[in-house]
């Protein structure tokens, strides 16, 4: 992976690698050359535990910058106390929060139609745009 990244560096400002779920060899290969990691989690207890483990591994591998995106947030469930608020997730994980994506049926519709969500006038599409601006 390090060799591949070094070959790509001269031609690209950003190289994004989508890691497989879990912490197996695919994950370890993906972070081998990382200078930054963006951990994406949902506000569910099991997902937050997994994200915390991932952040620990990233820290142990001396990844200099770790950011967080909280995905599939449902404000109605947060208000009823059925889902953890984003602020609590950020506090538990203790890394820089660069954005949240609220659950949006337009994501499913766009995915099924094969259309880009970023072109949609929807909450999730705007969230993606904001997160992209914070990455750059």
What are these regions (language model features)?
Residues 111-126:
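C-terminal boundary of histidine-terminating zinc-finger modules
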Residues 127-135:
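C-terminal alpha-helix
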């Amino acid at each position: 992976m390090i060799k591949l990244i070094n070959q790509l560096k001269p031609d690209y400002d950003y190289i994004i690698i989508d890691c497989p779920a879990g912490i197996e060899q695919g994950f370890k290969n993906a972070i081998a050359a990382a200078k930054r990691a963006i951990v994406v989690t949902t506000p569910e207890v099991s997902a937050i535990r997994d994200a915390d483990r991932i952040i620990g591994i990233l820290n142990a591998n001396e990844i200099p910058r770790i950011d967080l995106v909280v995905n599939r947030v449902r404000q109605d469930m947060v208000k009823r106390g059925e889902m953890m608020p984003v602020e609590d997730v950020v506090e538990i994980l203790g890394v820089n929060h660069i954005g949240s994506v609220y659950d949006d049926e337009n994501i499913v519709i766009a995915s099924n139609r094969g259309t880009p969500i970023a072109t949609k006038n929807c909450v999730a599409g705007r969230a993606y745009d904001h997160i992209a601006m914070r990455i750059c």
